[in-house]
A protein has these predicted regions:
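Conserved non-catalytic scaffold segment of RNase H-like nuclease domains
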Residues: 1-113, 127-133
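A short, structured active-site edge motif that brings together acidic residues
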Residues: 112-122
């Protein structure tokens, strides 16, 4: 089975505040071995990036201004992940943003049953330890 390790960066922490995705990064694997296929896009979020978010990912409003919007890359993104298991660290965050973006386009969201949350897996394997990606 093919898997996709997926991560996003956003303008802020909550879709309730209309924050948007500014970057999607995906690496495909097969049996957890990299296939050398990637999907990586930086996006114009069509809104301001919060100062706190810039401190996390470094993407400024000026830098993102001429990048494509989510609607332009959505078909290619969905094709890339189709039929694959998604491995996401802190999946509710990334999946929430991805499904928010898809909902804005009247596209059905990504189902939870194709997602493995590596944060939840790490909690079981490394109880009581720091679980940020840099530590595991």
């Amino acid at each position: 089975m093919k898997e996709v390790f997926l991560d996003t960066e956003t303008t802020g922490l909550s879709t309730k505040d209309n924050h948007r995705i500014v970057e999607i990064a995906c690496i495909e694997t097969e049996g957890l071995i990299p296939t050398k296929k990637i999907f990586h896009k930086q996006l114009n979020p069509e809104r301001e990036v919060s100062e706190d978010a810039v401190k996390v990912h470094g993407f400024t409003n000026d830098y993102l201004r001429n990048k494509p919007t989510f609607d332009k890359i959505a078909p290619d993104f969905l094709k890339f992940i189709e039929g694959k298991k998604l491995i996401i660290h802190n999946a509710p965050f990334d999946l929430g943003f991805l499904n928010y973006e898809l909902k804005l386009l009247d596209i059905e969201g990504i189902k939870k049953n194709v997602v493995v949350d590596s944060l939840e897996t790490a909690k079981l394997k490394f109880p009581g330890q720091s679980l940020s990606l840099i530590h595991i």
